[in-house]
Amino acid sequence: MKNERIFYATIDEQIEKLKRQGLIIDDIDFAKAQLELYGYSNLIKSYRDPYTIISEDQKVYRSGITFNQVLSLYILDKNLRNAVMASMLDLEEHVKEAAADIIASKYGTNPNDYLQFRNYVNKKKRKQRFSLPAILDKLKGALNTDKDPIAHYSQKYGAVPPWILFKSIYFSTIVNFINLFKPEEQLALAEKLYDADALNIHGNSLVSLMLDTLFICIEYRNLAAHGGRTYNHECKSRLRLSMESNNRIHGFSQLLFLLNMLKYQLPFKHLSKSLNHQLNRHCSMYPEDITYLGQILNVNIVQRTPVWVASKSNRYHMDRHCCGIKNPIELELADAQKQGLHPCKKCCHEDF
């Protein structure tokens, strides 16, 4: 079959195409600026599907859909993607430190000792770069650098402990290395990362939970790093844990579920807070999207818009730090409006 040609289109031509497809554009100049900034493919092609139908073999927008609505969904996902990246970097640092502690406590702090082949399990790997020989070569190769902190430890102590070496290694390499730990070390690491008694998960099941979680986190980290659509992503990596709640979760809610099981809660809290903020922002402007996003994200969306008020003031603020207010009082937006308070002109605007 002959491939369809891809044609270049100017911003003006992109605008005309969107209008022909029925998308409502209230501010042409604003729409042009956003397309120039983010790109048609990133903004429109990646986020139009919930808002389009096929009519007479043509893709058209459903009645009433605006450019700003598509843009808002894009912004939701962009901010969610950034939050995923931040949370995964935080988790990465924690996991590397925990893994290094397990290795150092068992095999010492000298790489000549802790990077011995016999200390790990040589599993057959589909990808050669994640085999034990390849990973050990990569770890040993990272020792040969003139960059700190590895160079500093090599020169001053003649050895680089694992908690320093792991800093310079990709998270995916570390996770695949953990997968090659001996069962005793894997369990010790899992018990460091989880409260096994509170979860009532022990032994091999706890190790499987840890490994599955780490591989799912790698997938989301890589997705976020390469600008992939995040809010409706379905992981290729699978969770083997058998429990009733696991049967009901998928996609982004699964990531939150797994992060919430860890002892270290900051990655979960940061990501959950970002999701709630973005859903509140988007759904307060486009409540018709609540059902769709609730189903995709597998969450119960309850609109909540907090605002802040200074004592003896008749204005409410979306930004609690606006105008240097001290000891702000938090209210629901609806309550502030019922009390006759007025929005601050500085911080109360459409928060794209």
List where the protein language model places each region.
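Amphipathic alpha-helical interface elements
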Residues: 1-303
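Mature, structured domains enriched in cysteine- and short glycine motifs
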Residues: 302-352
